[in-house]
């Protein structure tokens, strides 16, 4: 099985280059200001100018953005736009995101409390869904493990959609994660870092080596 990998939280060109050379199919850039891996659009532009990557393989990441911020991401030219939001976030705003971005480019990442199921009402709004770890006060990048059992069920039940497994993935658990969830696409961030926003190249190498 071929596994697609997105390395997220890129803030430096040297890390972007190494991730691509190691086998990453996507790079993620976090525009959320409260993230320790926050990066500005002009900084992403400077990094991407000399990268061997098509814009379609660059992913912009935000949390509950307003339409103006979302439009800036679209205008930048990201191939995909990954949006995190609370479980009870208004569906009418999600529909507006879908209309503005388009379901093909939109990756929806609901923050799902473990006792709740997947909200079926959002399925028509995007073609891709990312399952990250749940914490009450943060959106992604926590190093915590996500709901693997839920991911496995939802990927099988809603198999016309693309599902991305995120949350606490590392060289130490990527083999178990893929074998347990049957994930075809994974997102790694803090598990291959020295510090927030600074990647550990040895861990990146080990991560790709350990993919089953």
Task: State what each model feature region is.
Residues 1-185, 190-212:
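Conserved N-terminal beta1-alpha1 strand-loop-helix module at the mouth
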